[in-house]
A protein has these predicted regions:
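Asp-based, Mg2+/Mn2+-dependent phosphohydrolase catalytic module
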Residues: 1-8, 38, 96-101, 122, ...
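N-terminal helical cap/lid subdomain that shapes the substrate entry/recognition surface
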Residues: 3-119
Length: 237
């Protein structure tokens, strides 16, 4: 069947959050905190290890600092409040020099400068637009990612965004994919879902969508991971 619509995941698929050291270093600089470089490296590694950076290392944290954070984790992407509380809860597991830094770190991850598009993202999205293929972004996320796409010149290629926190449901629930298809006037069998999570993004198959997976890697380690999407569309997936 002809592929008329492609849905993309956001984090780890089209864009990737900055490395944890840059995330922490930028936050410290913006708030006037100065730490020895060795301590910055150590704290960044700890933040990454506990899973405190949204969009960072995939997978659930090894352990949770408290019962409330553990309770929020499975539903963190269903509301902005749950997302913030879950990630700042994990961050507070790491002793930073100022408690306010936990909220500042969370705020930084929502800013466009904290995200890097994968090297081939622009060209692949432009290629889909040139082919007349509709494009949607379907993301498990707790904040509005549209400004990130605008800042990086990708928004012009996206026809609709379906963000979990705006609908109170998260992938792999088929309802989120159904909402995305509905916004684009698409049916499942004529849609290709592209993502990095077999568990979350694989949920699109319940609607009859074809699914293509990419690896969740740093942008420097995945220069052409999205390019096969154009071939799949040309071949009808």
């Amino acid at each position: 069947m002809t592929i008329k619509t492609v849905l993309f995941d956001f984090s780890g698929t089209l864009l990737r959050i900055e490395p944890a050291e840059e995330w922490l270093r930028g936050t410290l600089a913006a708030t006037g905190h100065v730490l020895p470089e060795a301590r910055v490296v150590e704290l960044a590694a700890e933040l990454e290890r506990v899973g405190a950076q949204p969009g960072g290392a995939p997978g659930a944290p090894v352990r949770f600092p408290d019962a409330r954070t553990a309770e929020l984790w499975p539903v963190r992407d269903e509301s902005a409040a749950a997302h913030r509380a879950a990630y700042t809860g994990l961050s507070r597991h790491v002793p930073l020099p100022d408690d306010a830094l936990h909220e500042e770190l969370y705020a930084r991850h929502m800013r466009p400068e904290g995200w890097r598009p994968y090297p081939d993202a622009h060209d692949v999205l432009a290629g889909l637009r040139a082919r007349g293929v509709r494009v949607g972004v379907v993301s498990n996320v707790g904040w509005d990612i549209r400004p990130v796409f605008r800042a990086h010149g990708l928004d012009a290629f996206v026809d609709a965004y379906t963000l979990s926190f705006e609908h109170g449901v998260q992938k792999p629930d088929a309802r989120l994919f159904a909402t995305a298809c509905g916004l684009l006037g698409a049916s499942g069998p004529e849609t290709l879902m592209v993502g990095d999570s077999r568990e979350a993004d694989g949920g699109a198959s319940a609607l009859g969508c074809a699914v293509h997976f990419v690896e969740h890697l740093p942008v420097t380690s995945r220069p052409a991971g999205l390019r096969p999407v154009l071939g799949l569309v040309d071949a009808g997936a």
